[in-house]
């Protein structure tokens, strides 16, 4: 009977690695510690009733390699033997996977733990620097990912070990500071009366911010898709879209600076996800770094902390692969999150 336990033993190879998002799931297989991961085509979560079916048809039916273990990154709380995902209908049931897919060892981690693992050793070709600060590369870091929501994860460096720290940093309060903020914030859609960072710093948050600006300026909104807003902002064809993305970058800078101070992230703050990649030109304008550094009495500290956009196309899989190869380099807690035959 499969059981949940705490184990420091390495996962046995071959290892199935999965990054499970709300819309797409990405999988690879790592055959040994020295091999390059074998990538599989992205799987649309809506195309399969269960994650087990997606793994069987999207991975196992396409390879002769039978994984002995699996490490899966999911968006959702990992509190029991059934793990519902936040943004799709799948439920991860490790015991069922072990019984039905021939896998003997399953580890489930938070999606932003995987992103945090990825930023431990990103090369320059997989990141775009924002601003001129270079920082101390062997030091604690933090990653923020505006996407379906706002994910936040820390990566603490201590005793020659990288320790990923998952959390719910995307739900911290975000309040107005400038005169323009005080005009706009009363029109931001709230959750139970409060504006969290995620109410602005994600895809739907971008639309939320755009609509609030339209209300303040007495303009009828014409866009409902975050991609439309960003594209019109970047080409300068819509003034409300331009201001929306400019303020988005400002507010992202404020939150990123806060997280840098929480984690003393001298090794850098990393922005992950498709939104960050798409708005790199806006992030390179002064607003983002100005907001990031505007943290009196610690502005001098913030000026030394580098900021990057993660450009690696499969960052979470890369982070999980790094852990799978060399688990001793990372302080990943497996208690209550690892199931073995």
From Swiss-Prot:
Molecular function in Gene Ontology: ATP binding; D-glucose binding; glucokinase activity
Organism domain of life: Bacteria
Q: Which keywords does this chain's UniProt record carry?
A: ATP-binding, Cytoplasm, Glycolysis, Kinase, Nucleotide-binding, Transferase
Where is this gene product found?
Cytoplasm
Q: What is its main location?
A: cytoplasm
EC number(s) given by UniProt: 2.7.1.2
Q: Which reaction does it catalyse?
A: D-glucose + ATP = D-glucose 6-phosphate + ADP + H(+)
> GO cellular component terms?
cytosol
Q: Could you provide one GO biological process annotation from this protein's UniProt record?
A: glycolytic process
Supply the InterPro entries for this chain: ATPase_NBD, Bacterial_glucokinase, Glucokinase
Can you tell me which residues bind ATP?
A: 18-23
Among PANTHER family, the record links this protein to:
GLUCOKINASE
Q: Which family is it part of?
A: Belongs to the bacterial glucokinase family.
What's the protein name? Answer: Glucokinase
The coding gene here is glk
């Amino acid at each position: 009977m499969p059981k949940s336990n705490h184990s420091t033993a390495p996962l046995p190879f071959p290892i199935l690695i999965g990054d499970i998002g709300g819309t797409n799931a990405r999988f690879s297989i790592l055959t040994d510690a020295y091999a390059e991961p074998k990538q599989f085509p992205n799987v649309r979560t809506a195309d399969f009733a269960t994650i087990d079916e997606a793994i069987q048809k999207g991975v196992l039916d396409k390879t002769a390699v039978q994984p002995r273990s699996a490490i899966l990154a999911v968006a959702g709380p990992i509190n029991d033997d059934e793990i519902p995902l936040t943004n799709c209908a799948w439920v991860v049931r490790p015991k069922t996977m072990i019984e039905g897919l021939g896998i003997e060892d399953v580890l489930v981690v938070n999606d932003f733990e995987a992103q945090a693992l990825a930023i431990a050793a990103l090369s320059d070709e997989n990141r775009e620097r924002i601003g001129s600060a270079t920082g101390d590369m062997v030091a604690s870091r933090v990653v923020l990912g505006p996407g379906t929501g706002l994910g936040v994860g820390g990566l603490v460096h201590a005793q020659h070990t990288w320790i990923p720290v998952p959390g719910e940093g995307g739900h911290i309060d975000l309040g107005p500071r400038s005169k323009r903020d005080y005009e706009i914030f009363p029109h931001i859609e709230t959750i139970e009366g409060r504006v969290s960072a995620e109410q602005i710093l994600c895809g739907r948050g971008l639309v939320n911010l755009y609509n609030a600006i339209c209300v303040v300026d007495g303009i009828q909104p014409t866009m409902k898709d975050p991609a439309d807003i960003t594209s019109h902002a970047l080409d300068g064809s819509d003034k409300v879209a331009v201001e929306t993305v400019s303020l988005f970058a400002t507010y992202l800078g404020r939150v990123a600076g806060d997280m840098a101070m929480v984690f003393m992230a001298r090794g850098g703050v990393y922005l992950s996800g498709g939104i960050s990649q798409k708005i790199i030109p806006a992030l390179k304008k002064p607003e983002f770094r100005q907001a990031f550094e505007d943290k009196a009495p610690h502005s001098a500290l913030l000026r030394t902390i580098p900021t990057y956009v993660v450009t690696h196309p499969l960052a979470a899989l890369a982070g999980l692969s790094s852990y799978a190869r060399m688990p001793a380099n990372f302080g990943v807690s497996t208690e209550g999150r690892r199931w073995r035959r």
